[in-house]
Amino acid sequence: MAKHDLSDATLPDFKALEAECMSIVLQNGKVPETRAAILPLLKKASIDGREAALRHLTTNGSGLECAGMISNLQDNLITLVHRMVTQAVYPTTQQEFAVAAVGGYGRSTLAPGSDIDLLFLLSVKAGADARKAVEFLLYILWDLGFKVGHATRLVEECIRLSRTDMTIRTAILETRFICGEALLVGELQKRFDAEVVEKTAPEFIAAKLAERDERHRKAGDTRYLVEPNVKEGKGGLRDLHTLFWIAKYYYRISDPADLVKLGVLSRQEWRMFQKSDDFLWAVRCHMHFATGKPEERLSFDLQPEIARNLGYNARPGLSEVERFMKHYFHVAKNVGDLTRIVCASLEDKQAKAAPGLTAAIGRFAHRPRRIPGTPEFIEDRGRIALSGPDIFKRDPINIMRFFHVADLHGLEFHPDALKAITRCLPLIDHDFRENEEANRLFLSILTSKRDPALMLTRMNEAGVLGKFIPDFGRIVSMMQFNMYHHYTVDEHLIRSVGILAEVDQGQHADIHPLAVKLMPNIEERTVLFVAVLLHDIAKGRQEDHSIAGAKVARRLCPRLGLNDKQTELVVWLIDQHLLMSMVAQTRDLHDRKTITDFAEKVQSLDRLRMLLVLTVCDIRAVGPGVWNGWKGQLLRTLYYETELLLSGGFSESPRKERAKQAAEQLAEALSDWSQKDQKTYTKLHYQPYLLTVPLEDQVRHAHFIRQADKADQALATMVRTHSFHAITEITVLAPDHPRLLSIIAGACAAAGANIADAQIFTTSDGRALDTILINREFPIDEDEMRRANTISKMIEDVLAGKKRLPEVIATRTKGRKRNKTFTVKPHVTISNSLSNKFTVIEIECLDRIGLLAEVTAVLADLSLDIHSARITTFGEKVIDTFYVIDLVGQKITNENRQGSISVRLKAVMSEQPDELREQMPSGIIAPAATKSPAAEKKARV
């Protein structure tokens, strides 16, 4: 790549610096004293030069120029030290070695925190002093704080090693002379070209592409990860470097601009190359300057600062960081386009390679063949290719036919064909979009029984999807600045379609069995595929994306060929696509009002089935680890309860009668107990417990409570884990207390456990039976049970007063550092319409360790009795819902009291000073010496 010239004004005065350093060297005869004397001068020059580069980056914005300035600065420093060494310290070595830059430094670009890769080339006549001179130079660089990757070799050694070591071969490919004996570097480059590069291009290209694929696999094989690696990630700088290495090796060029002269890239594509390279270098340089280290991962905490430094401003619906990251992913996509274009050109050159018997046999064996019924396309080694150069210009609809034929025949894509499509994107105009055949073919691709996600991905990468559906084009490369969504919006939508296709094919029944079971019964399969593709299409707008997306669907669906009924169903699904997820995760599914309200919105079993499948696809496509068995269980519970109501099977028998029947069933399940024990332990529970807790859990609880009573334990815990549900259950038996849930939550926080749900019940003898569900951490049950026992021990120790809650919480981090990057405005909603019996309090704020403990402590301090709680985390944001009543069992209807509750909760969520938090109770509720109620009764007798 071209070297970046700098005016003398931008760098320190190296002539004056050299004169001063040379004077010091001549005055000091000893090497150590010489190094120590000149080091401060060189260090100041290095600092001043890098500060100048940062100023230039800030004012000019060019990343390549900044990287070029730092490279030039480094050249000057190395040249200066080399002159001192060879002229004053080891004067006999002037013609015995050369210093060359390799790697990225060899391209005359250097990031602020990057290593300096040097090759010291020795003459065959070099003596011991030459190696001492190299050592002197290296010590200076190390003393200056640089990380130096280096090798000292003869030209012959370089040639020999590069034949077998692809890393060394790549480094030598980019060798650039800095100072010393230039003839040595010239000899290396000449011999390398003749003895190594000649006739080995296919081998080198294959190795570099395999290396790239492995790098992508390690970094995350998508260019749309929302915390990308700017250097190593897909669509990053290393991909551009690989492209240049391949082009330089194959075409024997020294400047990427020569690819235009060779006809590999158009002028427009070359400008894309330059802009992409410059942008990625700007981002990388800013990252290094901001962190003071070679940071390559564009993490959430860095993104806002880099966005500001690059001058991005917020626009309606998109913050400045979201606009910056959209640009970043757009550039990453362009890098992918350029890679395809160059690979297509290389393959074309290979196909026209040297004649001969072997080549002829190879071409015959892989001779392209016609695809029946499609004269426009041919199959070339399992890939769809074009039968002529003007296929798309003659009939633009061939662009859509291309993807449809590839899907029908299960073909991959020839890079030359994709390059042609990219260059013909202007043909996808209004007439194309309104063409009936184009829309029919697209719908066939979307609803394919094969791999629609792959086709959509290729269409998206080629730019076709965004041109064909302009509203989709608006969300291409769009990221959402939060810790919940792992991918850009377009990637999320395509992954959602891929998961729907898997469900449609009956795959992963172990992960989401209900969705797989329901899919064959969904009549409007096409509607579901369209809804899944479009459900987030209106992200990034001022209007709620569900509402705006429904409007987009109402316009688009008729164009795709859907009738009025199908269109309205797609519109409803998009408008309500978050409903089932939010109800399942934030509402008490054992509260009948939850089910009746949800059923009233859904209205039909067909809608219910489709909404369930859409919800599963949406959550699973958010990112790794977001879907788990617990969420699946919540969705299944909501589905089955609603299905029962919509199908007319919801029981209307009196609550009291149903509770009586439940108690009788429990007694029957305990038939091997004495009648006295049966009566005692069935009468412990009130109606809410009997009507909501499954019978098998009631039986477990009965055994648990009786065992605690026999052991005279006032405080006891029981644990079990569910690998399928991905949760671990901790049941706590303790004397009832207003702050019990708060203290349990605090103990869980201290143990590092994330509470997913809480069921709270009071027994007739004044005890609390609380069941806490925490997210699993380990896949193996034995490991998870050890963790669960540790957490339950922490709960017991805190409740028994063996450990003080404020102290154990203080041992944990004060909060997740990454969360501090985000802003979630604290919000409190208090509703009396979501439950017939309870007031529902919902809070939304930034998540942090110990938050639930503090919130529940506030509710207890406000004399509110928590019946149940739902704790839901969306990345950095938490939505906690509490079903509460006052101390006399009534809803909270007084507006003034609701206002005071809201104020107190917002103060805690905002981490404002609060007396309650300062005076948090030690946690003593059930001292170890306290006897159980049964034991006390026995003692009185």
Curated annotation (Swiss-Prot):
Segments of this protein annotated with the region Uridylyltransferase: 1-372
EC number assigned by the record: 2.7.7.59, 3.1.4.-
GO biological process entries: regulation of nitrogen utilization
InterPro entries: ACT-like_dom_sf, ACT_dom, HD/PDEase_dom, HD_domain, NT_sf, PII_UdlTrfase/GS_AdlTrfase, Polymerase_NTP_transf_dom, UTase/UR
Cofactor: Mg(2+)
PANTHER family, sorted: BIFUNCTIONAL URIDYLYLTRANSFERASE/URIDYLYL-REMOVING ENZYME (PTHR47320), BIFUNCTIONAL URIDYLYLTRANSFERASE_URIDYLYL-REMOVING ENZYME (PTHR47320:SF1)
Record-given protein name: Bifunctional uridylyltransferase/uridylyl-removing enzyme
Organism: Allorhizobium ampelinum (strain ATCC BAA-846 / DSM 112012 / S4)
